[in-house]
Amino acid sequence: MENTGKIFGISLGPGDPELITLKALKALNAVDVIFCPGTKSGEGRMKSRALDILRQLEVDETKIRLFQVPMSRDRQEALCAYDRVCGEVLELVRSGKSVGITAEGDACFYSSAHYMYGQLAQAGFPVAMIAGVPAFIAAGASVGLHLVKQQERLLVIPGDVIVEELLETIVGKRTLVIMKVPLGEAVL
């Protein structure tokens, strides 16, 4: 019988290393390998907010594997990058290694890593998800703002929102959170 490891989707929280959950920190320290997304800057250097968080948490850097996720509206290159990472993850877990795949904020909330989580589950290796603090929750707390009270409604939409939908929400006096804002800069 083959010895297989486990896969964890590890939420890193909104960027402040003190806002990572205890469960996520324990997982980061326990896994054998950590996959961490990054992007290339205009100057061609790799940058990764996730890696910055891991460094601030003093996670063992020898087990971190930084991978590039191309950022563009055409997601084909990013999907290819995720496919490559999934191949590496599957190889590792089949050899008995435990693997963490990091995501900023919460790994189940507007996370690009969901492509990998789904693909790994389809391959017969479900990902144990570890919840995190989404950025909009942390932002509200940082300024003492209650996002919603009692019967108020909260609407979360992606940055590529349609202008009419945005106006309807504003007229309806609902609390609105727009995620992935660079996608909708032209609209805003």
Placement of each model-derived feature along the sequence:
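Short gly/pro/ser/thr-enriched loop/turn and capping motifs at secondary-structure boundaries
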Residues: 41-44, 134-137, 185
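A contiguous loop/helix-start segment that scaffolds small-molecule binding in enzyme catalytic cores
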Residues: 7, 169-188
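Structural motif
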Residues: 37, 160, 179-183
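Residue-level signal for alpha-helical context at structural boundaries
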Residues: 72, 154-157, 184
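Thr-Gly-centered strand-to-loop micro-motif
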Residues: 103, 157, 178-180
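Class I S-adenosyl-L-methionine
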Residues: 1-17, 22-25, 29-126
